[in-house]
């Protein structure tokens, strides 16, 4: 769970306050919002970073999922304070209309946002970004890879500016920010002939974005590989969708186990494979990662998707120590 119950959450905030912490950033999960786990906590600013098919085993419909997320802005955002919205996300027009109807001030971030990304030059080393905000142009470089991560970075910058920090000062500091572990994290170095990335992408939208970003960076005649699975006891509808996305964008698809939990992992892999043309199945995730890395050649790129920063794998009701990042690092060193 990413959002604690109201009492625990309040205790945590009180402890941070007693320790002299004046500003806190936290994730408000859709489950937590729907169950009112934030209680009466009010926030100075709130952001809507992404929205795509996920958690339908709980929310049942996309509309139910969206309405749960919007609770943050109607119940927990201080009246008159600003929401920050990713202008590139699914249902943006609906979200925009909703905020206008509720008289909630908002700022948009994206290719056509109030914080407007004018140019974004990508490389395996990071990206160079040119943006415009309130008539002023800014440029900076970051080692964080992926245009969608550039939007997240600028959303975070706008949230901080809403706390009273000058936007110019924030932009100056952005090059110092390191990539979040497991978010298009590069395992290899520039010296490697091939490249390996680990990403948390576990939804159709996230998988598509990560694969598209890496496809743009791939040099010919290299191939784009993807190793991924889907979690058990979770949304089953997304499995064939993710299989289709993987097979349409990647050159080589390897279906493996994610966190099967109490579901039959063969069934999960089969549902993904329904729409994944010519995909290979390797049930054991560690073997799938190691075997695929051993096959990589010059200019190939591998995306290991689904678990990202996680340091465990759930099989049945047991949690085992497991890290895509560590396994990939060791495999790269051995090749």
PLM regions with names:
Residues 1-29:
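Conserved nucleotide-sensing/catalytic segment adjacent to the nucleotide-binding pocket
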Residues 19-22, 43-196, 273-275:
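Acidic, Mg2+-coordinating active-site environments of NTP-dependent enzymes
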Residues 27, 50, 86, 227-229, ...:
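Short beta-strand segments
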Residues 31-39:
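Conserved helix/coil segment N-terminal to the catalytic DExD/H
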Residues 39-51, 219-227:
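Inter-motif core of Ras-like GTPase G domains
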């Amino acid at each position: 769970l990413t959002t604690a119950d109201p009492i625990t959450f309040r205790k945590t905030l009180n402890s941070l306050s007693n320790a002299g912490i004046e500003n806190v950033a936290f994730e408000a999960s859709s489950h937590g919002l729907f169950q009112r786990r934030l209680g009466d906590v009010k926030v100075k600013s709130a952001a809507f970073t992404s929205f795509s098919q996920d958690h339908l085993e709980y929310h049942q419909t996309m509309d139910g999922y969206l309405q749960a997320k919007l609770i943050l802005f109607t119940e927990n955002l201080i009246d008159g304070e600003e929401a920050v919205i990713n202008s590139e996300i699914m249902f943006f027009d609906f979200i925009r209309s909703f905020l206008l109807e509720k008289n909630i001030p908002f700022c948009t971030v994206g290719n056509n946002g109030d914080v407007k990304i004018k140019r974004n030059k990508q490389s395996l080393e990071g990206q160079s970004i040119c943006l415009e905000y309130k008539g002023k142009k800014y440029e900076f470089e970051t080692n964080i890879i992926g245009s969608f991560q550039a939007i997240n970075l600028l959303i975070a910058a706008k949230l901080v500016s809403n706390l009273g920090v000058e936007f110019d000062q924030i932009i100056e500091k952005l090059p110092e920010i390191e990539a979040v572990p497991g978010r298009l994290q590069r395992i290899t170095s520039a010296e490697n002939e091939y490249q390996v990335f680990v990403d948390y992408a576990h939804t159709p939208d996230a998988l598509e974005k990560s694969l598209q970003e890496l496809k743009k960076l791939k040099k010919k005649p290299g191939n784009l590989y993807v190793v991924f699975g889907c979690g058990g006891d979770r949304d089953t509808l997304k499995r064939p969708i993710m299989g289709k996305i993987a097979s349409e964008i990647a050159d080589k698809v390897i279906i493996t186990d994610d966190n099967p939990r109490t579901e039959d992992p063969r069934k999960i892999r089969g549902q993904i494979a329904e729409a994944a043309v010519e995909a290979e199945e390797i049930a054991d995730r560690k073997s799938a990662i190691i075997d695929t890395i051993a096959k990589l050649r010059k200019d190939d790129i591998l995306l290991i998707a689904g678990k990202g920063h996680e340091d465990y794998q759930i099989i049945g009701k047991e949690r085992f120590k497991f890290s895509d990042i560590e396994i990939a690092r060791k495999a790269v060193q051995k090749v």
